[in-house]
Amino acid sequence: MTPRAGATALALAAALLSATEGCGPRPAAPPPGPPPVPLHLAPACDLAPAAGLEWIIDARPRAIAEVPDLIPVLAVLVPEARFAAFAAAHGGVDVRQIAELCVAKYKEARLTIARTALDPARVERAFADRATHAGGRSIDVVNPPVVRVWGEVHGEAQQLLLFGREAALLEQGRAGPARAAEAFALGKLRRASPALRGSPLSNVAEILGEAPVRAFAPGPFEGDSAHGLGGLMRASSAVAASARFAGPPAKIAVRLVLTGAWGKSAHAAASRLAAAVHVLSESPFGRLLGVDRPVVAPLVTGSDDALVMEATFDGAALARGLHDALDAEVTDIIGGPARAPR
């Protein structure tokens, strides 16, 4: 190496050393975030606790809305304007796109659980806009984010839980069911069973089978409800009903199940249920719904532990009747103005 080349190399090494010393040690990498917490969100009704339950509805709105023959039926029951009003008031959530919807009524609260793709920030803003008295906000889980916000809406306590972008839960009324639902979602209530997994609804759910719309009520039944269906409700441990599409143009197959210790009285109880169904079909309300003109006449069977009624009805007639009879209630649930009196 020549003296000139050696001097050049020495100067370059000195420059590199100086630059290294000036930069100091490399900054430490940020610590990793908390590991993801597994969420158990399906089926939606597996988040509904059993304690204090009065009734529960399990529905698959998207599956219903995807049946072409049912689109005009839905339009009669719930006009497009009401779907739009609900979406505008709830952060863009379209009821018809909800994969699973569970509504559970308790003595002093109501729980609505929707499993659907959503924008959590938008849904949270919509809740804040509806609230007439702000409460608070908590991030219960960081990864994935489980956010809880609460407040009052026109004097009613309400609480919203957002499970990432996958599901939302709304509690209305006295606090309690939402906490249990969150614990189910986080897998913290291993010794407890959700409403449809424990007695007495697990048995009636198994007999009823799967359907896009199902409704359940646990016994014992007292007061006016005990006199329902020819007095059979008093002896029932649970009652459930389902509805499903049964073919064009808009046939709806309905199944009704009453569980109880019917034993040797099953045949007589089945005859009593058939008579009660006939009385209902011939009543003003039954005629309004068109159940006095079934597509397939009701068939009632009985066994030691269950009474089962199956029939098929005209879905268009059912929708028209329900629209006329329950218009105010649908307005309360979906939102939007009620129709003008006729």
Where are these regions (language model features)?
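Long, low-complexity, Ser/Thr/Gly/Pro-rich intrinsically disordered segments that act as flexible linkers
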Residues: 27-139, 159-160, 244-250, 299-302, ...
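An internal, short helix-loop-strand segment that often contains or flanks glycine-aspartate motifs
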Residues: 64-96, 134-251, 264-265, 269, ...
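Short, conserved charged micro-motifs
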Residues: 66-68, 119-125, 262-271, 318-320
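Short amphipathic alpha-helices in soluble, non-transmembrane regions
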Residues: 125-131, 269-275, 325-326
